Amino acid sequence: MAKWGQGDPRWIVEEREDGTNVNNWHWTERDATSWSKGRLRELLVGITVENEAGRCEISELKQVEGEASCSSRKGKLIFFYEWNIKLGWKGIIRESGAKHKGLIEIPSLSEENEVDDTEVNVSKKKGDGDILKDLMKTAGTAKVREALGDYLKALKTEFTMGMILPTKAMAAQELTVERKLSENALQIQASSRVALGVRIPTVALHMTELFDTAIEQLYRIFTVKDLVQKFSKSPAVLEAEKGGKFQMLMETSPVNIQNC
């Protein structure tokens, strides 16, 4: 016998959550007949279709014969189901108010055929009312097949819950994934606290202007409010003293006068 952790990887030598028939590895079968009958009744009875000619409703599940089961073998699920279903429907013609009844028969719902290929036969009792029969053959049949598809989805998901149990390695892997997701969430939360924005590089700009005039005249141009306003052709703010405000163009920001 191989020691723990040794041997061909195809050998099943590992600790499992359950002890007997580990992870249902050997053949395990669960009867789904009773569950299926109840689910088929829930999904099929009450289906309604209507158009401008009339309205029809599946009123009862007259017969459901057959069986269904789900088997587990080496971690794989195998489904078996075979049903013969008869449904009763009733309808009313809008114009005349006449009421009619009929049957829907599904002779063979099994895993051998796709739901869209499943035979659905619609019949009606003698008399008028073929427009209701046609309604059930078209829209009614489509809704019946849709309900059968919902039954098969439920059989393969809801009914099989717990049939394949996780191994110890799978459980540890799931725990690692959850831990990584939690760590990623914490990192995202931490990074979200950092102030958002884009750092823009800036430089200092120094400019020198040469004025071809006398110093006294240049001084007056920048210290006499009337001369500043004539130069800028706009109102100006001028306080010719240390710390005073100087604003030559109104749309620019004011500056403070410093010693030169």
From Swiss-Prot:
GO biological process, one term: protein folding
Gene for this chain: AHSA2
Entry GO terms, CC: cytosol
Keywords: Chaperone, Stress response
SUPFAM superfamilies: Activator of Hsp90 ATPase, Aha1 (SSF103111)
GO MF: ATPase activator activity; protein-folding chaperone binding
Pfam (any one): Aha1_N
Source organism per UniProt: Bos taurus (Bovine)
Function: Co-chaperone that stimulates HSP90 ATPase activity.
Cited InterPro entries: Aha1, AHSA1-like_N, START-like_dom_sf
Name listed for the protein in its UniProt record: Activator of 90 kDa heat shock protein ATPase homolog 2
Origin: domain of life: Eukaryota
